[in-house]
A protein has these predicted regions:
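A structural signal for conserved, well-ordered secondary-structure elements
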Residues: 1-336
Length: 336
């Protein structure tokens, strides 16, 4: 690390090449978005959540998932996403299947929605109860189960669209609040650079999610990951801009250019930011290894966002700050 700190950091001068890396990823993600789109979960396009609650954990989860995915398909429903596993607060474990808002491969029309919901909560629920009992008997399982262990929750298309709209509004308000905070604590240039960095991090995460969309459903867990990413990104930005402000107040940098100040801030914030991200990634890996699938769905977007946030904080935000400073100086000179 000491050898690294002795090297010259000319990150600002390399800004065009560095931003090109991000633009390539974003452009590739855009191609996937236009082609296949995001893998929207039932939270945002409607559907149903079917929970099977058991006392003990299933030994062969793959066989269990395959069996009931096939059973639900035979009943006329399409299973989306992987089976989710989560512990119950009162003891036991829940296995959740997510069904698309369709029947026999066709979308449910408005006039047929009531029939769709009624069938799920009656005939399908009864058939599923019998199938669970039959499956446990066929594998000689002593796992306890009763008919109250089946829960079905339907999310309509209208409510899912309303949720999607509220999500976008909440994220927009959060970005505005962050911009105001950074502008008050630092400068307008710092605030604008931070917002550009946050937009970069979200775009990279969404782009990579589109590229790996088959494995990453976009649901409330994904939105929670985006909010977490914004938090980490703004923290890294504050570290950089705090160092820049410190340099601007120091007489040692009285005659230094904005580029020199930015490069110095990057160099002397590098270790702090990398150690912060590294410790977070260690915890993320631990969650992957020891957590249930509900949490694991949250992990990959977080990794994308952490890497994007580190890249933007060190390689993009300071350069964008320099750019906005130049624009500000030109505007002032024109007014004068």
């Amino acid at each position: 690390m000491s050898k690294l700190m002795k090297k010259d950091f000319n990150i600002v001068q390399r800004f065009p090449a560095l931003i090109a890396i991000s633009l390539i990823i974003i452009f590739t993600g855009l191609v996937f978005l236009l082609g296949e789109g995001l893998n929207l979960g039932i939270d945002y396009k409607g559907g149903a959540k079917v929970e099977i609650e058991l006392v003990d954990e299933i030994t062969d989860k793959e066989a269990f998932e395959e069996h009931f995915t096939s059973f639900m398909k035979g009943e006329g429903y399409t299973v989306v996403d992987k089976m989710m596993e989560s512990p119950l607060t009162e003891g036991g474990i829940s296995y959740e299947f997510r069904l698309a808002y369709e029947y026999n491969g066709a979308g449910v029309e408005v006039e047929a929605q009531e029939a769709f919901i009624t069938r799920l909560n009656n005939e399908f629920k009864n058939d599923l109860t019998e199938e669970v009992e039959s499956y446990l008997a066929s594998v000689n399982s002593s796992n306890l189960f009763d008919e109250e262990g089946i829960n079905v929750a339907v999310i309509g298309e209208s409510s899912s669209k309303s949720l999607l709209n509220r999500t976008f509004i909440a994220l927009a308000l959060a970005l505005v609040a962050i911009l105001v905070y950074i502008m008050i604590r630092f400068t307008v240039s710092s605030g604008l650079a931070s917002i550009c960095g946050l937009a970069h991090d979200v775009l990279i995460t969404v782009s990579l999610t589109a590229i790996f969309g088959k494995y990453l459903p976009v649901n409330m867990t994904f939105i929670a990951a985006i909010i977490t990413i914004i938090g980490y990104s703004i923290n890294s930005s504050i570290v950089i801009f705090d160092k820049i402000r410190e340099c601007q107040k120091s007489t040692a940098f009285a005659y230094a250019s904005d580029e020199e100040i930015a490069n110095y801030a990057i160099k002397h914030s590098l270790v702090k930011i990398l150690l912060s991200i590294l410790t977070t990634l260690i915890m993320v890996v631990a969650l992957v290894l020891f957590s249930v699938s509900t949490i694991q769905e949250f992990i990959l977007p977080i990794i994308f966002g952490l890497l994007a946030g580190t890249f933007s904080a060190l390689c993009l935000n300071p350069s964008i700050w320099v750019l906005f400073r130049k624009i500000g100086s030109k505007l002032k000179s024109k007014k004068a």
